[in-house]
């Protein structure tokens, strides 16, 4: 096992809030790189450029810091999703083209974002260790996004642009489809380029519209 050392605060003076952000960012990197079991406070302090005691001044122990990381990532991921959702095509001129453009934005801003990748990795590696924490994440992360997206699809259906009985199911399927072509490669550490993101969005929307497009447009 590599030796770790406690370091003094080596950066220029920072506010309490700035140090808290630095610690959370460092902890995110260390937990994703080392896993929960392999991470320790000294590693996180060194990466944040603060002392070990400074980390403890903000978080009482490693477990509490891990919980804070998951909550912060969930909050940021949700913020990115809802900013992107504000661009949803409520009044589409061309339903396929407009949904493809929206799906590209979702892929870039959410699924392929750093926060999205970190969350997926932590869930995959540490979900069994903290079932209650990740149950809360499902409720306040995907649960909220599915509901919000379902409402938008419901409006499109009501306006006659789509044909669906259950917008909740449609929203989950839409998100699964736009993620499908990228998921495995991102799990292996690849970062999809713009062309792959565009193609994944196009494939997803065409499949989605075969199920939910108006019959005269299928």
Predicted regions and their residues:
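Hydrophobic alpha-helical connector segments
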Residues: 82-119, 170-174
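Hydrophobic/aromatic-rich alpha-helical bundle segments in the mid-to-C-terminal region
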Residues: 11, 135, 143, 157-206, ...
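An amphipathic alpha-helix signature
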Residues: 24, 67, 96, 100, ...
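A short secondary-structure junction motif
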Residues: 73-80, 113, 130, 148, ...
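Helix-turn-helix
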Residues: 22, 26, 30-64, 68-72
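Residues in soluble alpha-helical coiled-coils and helical-bundle/repeat scaffolds
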Residues: 60-64, 68, 90, 111-114, ...
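N-terminal intrinsically disordered/low-complexity leader segments
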Residues: 1-18, 81, 85, 216-218
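Amphipathic alpha-helical packing segments from all-alpha helical-bundle domains
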Residues: 112, 117-124, 128-158, 199
């Amino acid at each position: 096992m590599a030796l770790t050392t406690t370091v003094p605060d080596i950066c220029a003076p920072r506010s309490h809030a700035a140090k808290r952000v630095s610690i959370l960012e460092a902890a995110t990197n260390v937990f994703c790189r080392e896993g929960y079991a392999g991470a320790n406070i000294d590693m996180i302090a060194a990466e944040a450029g603060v002392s070990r005691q400074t980390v403890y001044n903000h978080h009482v122990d490693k477990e509490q810091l891990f919980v804070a990381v998951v909550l912060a990532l969930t909050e940021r991921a949700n913020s990115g999703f809802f900013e992107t959702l504000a661009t949803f095509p409520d009044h589409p001129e061309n339903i396929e083209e407009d949904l493809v453009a929206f799906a590209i934005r979702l892929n870039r801003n959410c699924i392929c974002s750093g926060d999205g990748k970190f969350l997926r990795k932590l869930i995959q590696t540490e979900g069994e260790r903290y079932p209650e924490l990740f149950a809360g994440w499902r409720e306040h992360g995907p649960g909220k996004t599915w509901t919000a997206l379902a409402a938008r699809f419901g409006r499109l259906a009501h306006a006659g642009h789509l044909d669906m009985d259950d917008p909740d199911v449609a929203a989950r399927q839409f998100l699964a489809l736009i993620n499908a072509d990228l998921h495995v490669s991102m799990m292996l550490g690849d970062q999809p380029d713009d062309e792959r993101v565009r193609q994944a969005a196009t494939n997803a929307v065409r499949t989605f519209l075969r199920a939910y497009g108006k019959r005269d447009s299928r």
